[in-house]
């Protein structure tokens, strides 16, 4: 599951292919960046002459591996949702009346959602769906009240901060 999800997510930005020994090879512009094993083991291109651009891409891939490992690990050990209409989802986290859940399909990969749920957990409502794990974690933190929305930067504020740096 980990390797398939990594391949799906990396395929959008990099050239990927499986080799004969079970490694996912990742390259960009014909330059090999790394190889990833089914369990997330990572071997990067050790060429000392790689440009900063390609080193940045390798760092991006490592971040992607870390993120995918996080949610795949949570998913593999998470209980099924109690609510009948969403029983194909697994509960990754809950706080108060807010739940973060995920569903996986071979064809489409992961879909994440935050819901409000009743006290018994047998009914959910006001779903916020996304395939983006980072977005849904933030949505969960805000919707559950763990982080006040006013403490987050808007896209415009983030852009202004980046221009100042």
What residue spans do the PLM features occupy?
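A cross-family detector of function-defining hotspots
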Residues: 23-27
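Negatively charged, low-complexity tracts enriched in Asp/Glu with abundant Ser/Thr
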Residues: 1-21, 46-90
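A short, exposed loop/beta-hairpin motif centered on an aromatic-Gly-Thr core
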Residues: 121-133, 148-150
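Short aromatic-glycine-(Arg/Gly/Cys) micro-motifs in beta-strand/loop hairpins
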Residues: 38, 100-126, 161-165
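Charged/polar low-complexity intrinsically disordered segments, enriched in acidic residues
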Residues: 149-165
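A structural microfeature
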Residues: 32-38, 44
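Short N-terminal "domain-start" leader segments
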Residues: 69-111, 149-154
